[in-house]
């Protein structure tokens, strides 16, 4: 019951994603099943600098974008 | 040409083109190669090696939440200069956003700016491109800007502070080579910043033609990645660039309507 109320929805890379309350950007990135070379994170279209990933707490309804480097021309 | 020979008119002794200086950086190869569309990392790495390139272009995308696979994880980043592009952006705002993300990713201030105007032709939006170029230069970026072959736009982009203007030979990925050598020649004549021909290369001779026109370099991706044997094509592209660079400086003969004998016309037997 309490667990349920502690979870909320965000938009992650354009898709609905459930996270626990008090999740930081760093927690989120570490929880993703990815092994990227490097990531950059935007929260509501503003870049969250790497130095602030640990202290930036994600809120309900946030739009989070996690991007990396891929092959391109 | 052997390494001990000297190219006339050039004080350097070498068998490869001189390095390319863009802004405050110097690159050993004038061939810039994209890292897109490779089937596997092994082929990509072998093709990049065969091309002799130093600058490779990359894209910035959302991480794939379902698959950790990323060919670039196997790219030797110590060996190459990564030039992020803004491919897929259709307005200045999105392109600037990608450049800022690129900076946050640790890729520095160098960007290949593309603001596209049309999904079918992937031709640049000249207005959005110019607007984004101005803003990025003001924000401290070194902007290598993808352009159409319009000489007026090329000049405007130079005035906006572009580090290099990169007109398309033909539409991206079309393999049509150099379609408007007249416009490209005018651009090459008018601009002071280095001009790199970007896009449309289908085969090695296209690269040679671009360099013979006087381009400072060539950027390509699909021409290598899409070839049946990408490594062999990368090898060909490398040598095609060298051939065009030397030919451009060697002073070609004039074209004539009729033949001119190569052998002596005197002393022919039977005369």
Model-predicted segments: where are they?
Chain A
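Ubiquitin-like/PB1-type beta-grasp interaction modules and other compact soluble beta-rich domains
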Residues: 1-72
């Amino acid at each position: 019951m309490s667990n349920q109320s502690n979870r909320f929805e965000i938009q992650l890379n354009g898709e609905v994603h459930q996270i626990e309350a008090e999740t930081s950007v760093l927690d989120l990135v570490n929880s993703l099943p990815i092994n990227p070379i490097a990531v950059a994170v935007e929260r509501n279209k503003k870049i969250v600098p790497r130095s602030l990933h640990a202290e930036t707490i994600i809120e309900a309804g946030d739009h989070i974008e996690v991007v990396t480097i891929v092959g391109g021309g | 040409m052997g390494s001990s020979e000297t190219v006339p008119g050039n004080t350097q002794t070498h068998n490869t083109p001189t390095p390319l200086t863009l802004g405050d950086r110097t690159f050993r190869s004038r061939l810039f190669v994209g890292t897109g569309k490779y089937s596997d990392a092994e082929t990509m790495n072998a093709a990049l090696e065969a091309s002799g390139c130093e600058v490779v272009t990359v894209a910035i995308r959302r991480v794939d939440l379902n698959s950790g696979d990323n060919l670039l994880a196997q790219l030797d980043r110590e060996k190459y200069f990564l030039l992020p592009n803004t491919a897929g952006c259709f307005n200045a705002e999105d392109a600037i956003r990608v450049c800022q993300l690129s900076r946050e990713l640790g890729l520095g201030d160098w960007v290949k700016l593309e603001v596209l105007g049309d999904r079918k032709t992937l031709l640049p939006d000249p207005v959005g491109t110019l607007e984004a170029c101005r803003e990025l230069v003001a924000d401290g970026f070194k902007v290598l800007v993808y352009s159409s072959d319009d000489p007026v736009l090329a000049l405007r982009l130079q005035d906006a502070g572009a580090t290099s203007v990169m007109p398309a030979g033909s539409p991206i990925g079309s393999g049509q080579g150099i379609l408007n050598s007249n416009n490209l020649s005018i651009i090459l004549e008018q601009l002071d910043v280095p001009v790199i021909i970007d896009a449309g290369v289908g085969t090695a001779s296209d690269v040679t033609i671009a360099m013979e026109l006087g381009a400072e370099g060539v950027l390509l991706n699909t021409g290598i990645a899409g070839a049946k044997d990408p490594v062999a094509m990368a090898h060909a592209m490398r040598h095609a660039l060298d051939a065009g660079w030397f030919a451009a400086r060697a002073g070609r003969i004039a074209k004539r309507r009729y033949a001119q004998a190569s052998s002596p016309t005197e002393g022919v037997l039977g005369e």
